[in-house]
Amino acid sequence: MSPTVTLQTPHLSDYPELVRVWEASVRATHDFLPDGYIVLLREHVLRKYLDAVMLVCCKDARRRILGFAGVANGRVDMLFVAPQYRGQGIGQRLLRHAVSELNAERLDVNEQNPQALGFYLHEGFEVYGRSETDGLGQPYPLLHMRLVRTTS
């Protein structure tokens, strides 16, 4: 990751860009979700979810948001990286910050997103439970994960 990438708290004026990153990331990694559901979720992200979490984002030297995480009550509720910046350590940096600075120890991941599951397993999380539906009651199973070890 470039040394010019910084972690910072996004402002309300960053919300439209956060939503763009969220949607691009979801479309790149959640191919099991129909378009109409992504559109519905996008509205929830903008109108409810961003305000319900403590946010941190990675910005580059041009102040573009490369990825972001949201934590509430010891849980990573959001971690999304723009597709063109995946594999560059952005998600790892955001997750490690969420764990070390925001006391995150739990998260849920879509069962149908094996790349995210592998990432969280690599970062020291383990699956401890499963639900048949997502947070809105739709048939997209979630795996419940908890931190069992920290990585360096």
Predicted regions and their residues:
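Conserved GNAT acetyl-CoA-binding A-motif
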Residues: 100-112
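Conserved acetyl-CoA-binding loop of GNAT-fold acetyltransferases
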Residues: 121-130
